[in-house]
A protein has these predicted regions:
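Short, surface-exposed, charged amphipathic helix/loop patches that serve as local interaction elements
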Residues: 2-84
Length: 84
């Protein structure tokens, strides 16, 4: 299962404009590797990077409002349980 999210604020990364992201469900081991003790924001960034198959550096370029929407949408869709 995958989910597509259209960004309100597209961004540039490695010379291309990114206006929509696609996320896949995570495997248990991926969630474990993404979890950063005591740092929920870093965990959320890593989860987004793994599930979108983009580097962390790309995820860090996402507008904060879009990132909040992404976190909410992935949580509501059951892609991961309270890693953010």
């Amino acid at each position: 299962m995958k989910i597509k999210i259209k960004l309100k604020y597209p961004f540039q990364f490695e010379g291309r404009e990114i206006s929509e992201l696609e996320f896949r469900r995570l495997k248990t081991g991926e969630v474990r590797r993404a979890t950063h003790k005591g740092d929920e924001m870093q965990t959320a960034i890593t989860v987004a990077a793994i599930s979108s198959e983009l580097p962390v550096e790309a995820i860090e370029e996402i507008d904060a409002a879009d990132f909040h929407e992404i976190s909410e949408a992935l949580g509501e869709a059951g892609f991961f349980s309270h890693t953010t």
